């Protein structure tokens, strides 16, 4: 029996057929599906590219893994099975960082303020960043804000309703754009915060606004299910009426409530505070209005408030309120937590901050490199904020805790200090010691090459002792948390940066920028892996004759500026690495520093 002949479908037959086959519809559907798949592929590629652009170091990777990596099963076999004839090539070893980035299991919360108003394109870019963070294991708890609305609710009933409708629509927009980027989101229109009544709730009255366990359940359920809760900036008053309040007050209340330990299996302790706005980071007095890169709240909070310029109230109207927000939230969050104030024009900074927990540029790099090089600081450069530690400058051995300093040096260098020899030398030659926190880090500077007799003569054009960086150490538990940058910046302000506007720092015992800058000199073993870090911060270096050491130096910026101005108005010749009047000093440095005895026991 012959198979039935299938009719041929042609355009002519379709015209004659009462119910033609929807060929065009299938084509359109396939085209639509293909377009969606391409959009998903493009977004995945952009996600992976943003991770690569963060350029995490080995320490950054370990830090990320400790917080976001999935737990390792205890029963994984360590032995490699014997190969059999049927075995092919062994599968490549898995990279734990890649697995943690692309397949996160732990969900860590972050508090996020989206400080609009934003256009659809701007808000979509922000929500794409939030979706990428969710893929990396950070679930954003978002509170929407609008700069174009009064911070508190209007007393006029109809105006209050209009304002409430605007922020409600803002929540819906955020959820919509998150969903477009395949990020599960949940609008929370319920009121999670309450305004304390001093008479009925005296314990909560100091907070002003607080979050009860019942209100926190909305956030806990969303985070536990991997959804992004998007909240209104509202709170219940004592009459159980919902009122719009400043978003910062809601975020502060959430930071306090989410950091309180409970028996719930969902850990709500926030790891980050992200403020996404239109004005960028917090402007710096020392950088002529460009943003701070890194803020040590313990040392700089009051100083930044005092030096905030009146004109910045127009260009950065919410900078100080966001600084207060960061200070309040970080007080409740873990030590390793940070806050990021970032413009919507810098979405890649969100990924970089999560993986590295570092600023866009190291704050300890030379100022000229930060403002003149490729990738330099702009108004949109984000500001990273940490709790930090207080910084002190000690100028006598009586102020130094020798036991704590010894413990820091021996722990950092993993060697035994010759205490008697080291401290006897410091009694004679100490210039100053910079201490961060309770000896979490320290920089010890001495004055070398001082006159030993009346016949002593300094080399020409170098009529002063050498400011020598004898020891620079950060405790291992504080490596990677910004302490090293805070320490180096304080060191620069007391030595080669002294006399510059940006050396006016608030550290206890510092010179506050008053004085004349001095060249800073130090040495490091030729095979020291830290030398790469020194190369980036020094003006130059040379190898000693025996090639065991490298001598580094940082030229006094004030003196370099004077030389530059002379060249600029006297023919325009560029400043050389070693000017004529500087010749001979490096040789003298090498001789003097080479005679310094070792601080370590044999």
UniProtKB/Swiss-Prot annotation:
It catalyses: L-glutamate + acetyl-CoA = N-acetyl-L-glutamate + CoA + H(+). It comes from the Eukaryota. It holds the Pfam family NAT. Residues 1-21, 62-93 are annotated as: Disordered. Pathway: Amino-acid biosynthesis; L-arginine biosynthesis; N(2)-acetyl-L-ornithine from L-glutamate: step 1/4. GO terms for biological process: L-arginine biosynthetic process; ornithine biosynthetic process. Its EC number is 2.3.1.1. Keywords: Acyltransferase, Amino-acid biosynthesis, Mitochondrion, Transferase, Transit peptide. Its main location: mitochondrion. Residues 389-577 form the N-acetyltransferase domain. N-acetylglutamate synthase involved in arginine biosynthesis. Belongs to the acetyltransferase family. This is Amino-acid acetyltransferase, mitochondrial. It comes from Cryptococcus neoformans var. neoformans serotype D (strain JEC21 / ATCC MYA-565).
